């Protein structure tokens, strides 16, 4: 499991309706995966690139 507790937070799309491509760490699969972020009210498990996600969570 990652040392960084942010990586264990659930994926959070948020209430807004933008479609921003982002990555999150999926603690079930143990991988960083893409999702579509709504643009507001993110949690800390939200990364602009897959590499950023991997660096934070692997």
UniProtKB/Swiss-Prot annotation:
Transmembrane parts of this sequence: none
Entry-linked SMART domains: KU (SM00131)
Pfam entry (one): Kunitz_BPTI
A molecular-function term among this protein's GO annotations: serine-type endopeptidase inhibitor activity
Entry keywords, A to Z: Disulfide bond, Nematocyst, Protease inhibitor, Secreted, Serine protease inhibitor
Record keyword Ribonucleoprotein present: no
Annotated S-S bridges: 7-57, 16-40, 32-53
Site location (Reactive bond for trypsin): 17-18
Domain BPTI/Kunitz inhibitor stretches: 7-57
Subcellular location: Secreted; Nematocyst
PROSITE patterns xrefs: BPTI_KUNITZ_1, BPTI_KUNITZ_2
Gene3D superfamilies reported for this sequence: Pancreatic trypsin inhibitor Kunitz domain
Principal subcellular localization: secreted
Tissues showing expression: Expressed by acrorhagi.
Stored InterPro entries: Kunitz_BPTI (IPR002223), Kunitz_BPTI_sf (IPR036880), Prtase_inh_Kunz-CS (IPR020901), TFPI/VKTCI-like (IPR050098)
GO CC, one annotated term: nematocyst
Its job: Serine protease inhibitor that is strongly active against trypsin (1900 IU/mg) and moderately active against plasmin. Also shows weak inhibition against chymotrypsin (70%), elastase (38%) and the metalloprotease thermolysin (14%).
Similarity field: Belongs to the venom Kunitz-type family. Sea anemone type 2 potassium channel toxin subfamily.
Misc. remarks from the entry: Does not inhibit potassium channels (Kv), as well as cysteine proteases (papain and bromelain). Is not active against kallikrein.
Protein name from the UniProt record: PI-actitoxin-Axm2a
Species assigned in the record: Anthopleura aff. xanthogrammica (Sea anemone)
């Amino acid at each position: 499991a990652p040392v960084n507790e942010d990586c264990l937070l659930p994926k959070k799309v948020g209430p807004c309706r933008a479609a921003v491509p982002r990555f999150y760490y999926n603690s079930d699969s143990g991988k960083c995966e893409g999702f579509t972020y709504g643009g507001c009210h993110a949690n800390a498990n939200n990364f602009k690139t897959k590499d950023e996600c991997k660096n934070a969570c692997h």
